[in-house]
């Protein structure tokens, strides 16, 4: 199945090496919901994979 895609509602600057930095309106493919607050995703624009705060994105 195609990946679930999310759009970034806000800009986020990574605070840890395993986190994604992204801009508002970036598209992110969901890889895994690690827990309620942190998900793993792939930033479509750069193909970078990392953790992101779930409250910064909304499903497309």
Name these PLM-found stretches.
Residues 1-60:
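Src homology 3 (SH3)-mediated interaction modules
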């Amino acid at each position: 199945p195609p990946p679930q895609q999310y759009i970034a509602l806000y800009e986020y600057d990574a605070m840890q090496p395993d986190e994604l930095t992204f801009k508002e309106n970036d598209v992110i493919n969901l890889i895994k919901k690690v827990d309620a607050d942190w998900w793993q995703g792939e930033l479509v624009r750069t193909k970078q994979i990392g953790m992101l705060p779930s409250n910064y994105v909304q499903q497309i």
